[in-house]
Amino acid sequence: MRGGVAGPTAGEPPGTEAEAEEVEESSAGDDEELELGLSLGSKKQQQQQHAPCRILTARDLQPAAALSPDSSVSSSSPAAAAAAGGKRAEGPTATTSPGTVASGHPHSSFGVVGWPPIRQFRMNSLFNQAKENTSETDTKKTATNESDVQKDKEEGEKKGRVAGWVKVNMDGEVIGRKVDLNAHRSYKTLALALELMFTKPSIGLCASHNTNSLKLLDNSAEYQLTYEDRDGDWMLVGDVPWEMFVSSVKRLRIMRTSDANGLGQRYQGIHRTIASTRGRS
């Protein structure tokens, strides 16, 4: 038939035309997807071009070995530090903020504390050395104190023992007294103090105590002042110098002259010698 739609030719198979139409439709769809992809890509490039630039800080360029004490990479290598800095510079994108930079260690923002490390044996040696110095100082102080005490003791022994407080008894008196020899510097003051102790106070005595105070040292008086030395011997007071008397006296006794006559005759020559020596001086 001449009118109407022309049918397939005799040489063409019946499904060839339909396949050709499907190929044209698929190629058209691919072209549309390609155009869509190109347009989206150009938009992303424009957004990246208009995005603000971020300045890298020291935290971004910090070496990876310094962030982790257990890392096997040495922080002293300049090549490793440069590589780590380059990776950190290229890693964050334009959309990331400085506070959201990824880190491989939770303590990446802190430096290594206690670097360089001190070995344990060095720390122990320093501690032991300080301890030895302290002990030596204490030993020297103790030795100095002991030497000072020993010196004081030797000086005291050289000067002689000071009697201090000694007992005083008087014939006819039941109760004794004590007197401090360190409070006196001569026999006269000692005799006056003993007379005031054992004699009842009266107006006449107070008026004439300067004259009566020497009676204890006089052989013609009613009472005589005697003392017992360290050897246990009884002697008359006034035979030896005052310093020797103070260092050797053990106790005092006010004896009656009749009882002390033996002591007076025994040491009569000594009294005469002392009296002549005092007269010459």
Swiss-Prot record:
Q: Which residues form the PB1 domain?
A: 163-259
Which SUPFAM superfamilies does the protein's record reference?
A: CAD & PB1 domains
> Which Pfam families does this UniProt record tie to the protein?
AUX_IAA (PF02309)
Main localisation: nucleus
Compartment(s) of residence: Nucleus
> Which InterPro entries does the record associate with it?
AUX/IAA_dom (IPR033389), AUX_IAA (IPR003311), PB1-like (IPR053793)
What UniProt keywords are attached to this protein's entry? Auxin signaling pathway, Nucleus, Repressor, Transcription, Transcription regulation
> Which stretches are tagged as biased composition: Basic and acidic residues?
133-157
GO terms under biological process: auxin-activated signaling pathway; regulation of DNA-templated transcription
User: What residue spans carry the region label Disordered?
Assistant: 1-115, 130-157
Q: Which domain of life is it from?
A: Eukaryota
User: Acidic residues bias: where?
Assistant: 18-35
Give the CC-aspect GO terms. nucleus
Find motif (EAR-like (transcriptional repression)) and give its ranges. 36-40
Composition bias, Low complexity: 7-17, 36-49, 63-84
Query: What is the protein's known function?
Result: Aux/IAA proteins are short-lived transcriptional factors that function as repressors of early auxin response genes at low auxin concentrations.
Quaternary assembly:
Homodimers and heterodimers.
UniProt family annotation = Belongs to the Aux/IAA family.
In Swiss-Prot or TrEMBL terms, this protein is called Auxin-responsive protein IAA10
- Which species is the source of this protein? Oryza sativa subsp. japonica (Rice)
| Gene responsible for this protein | IAA10
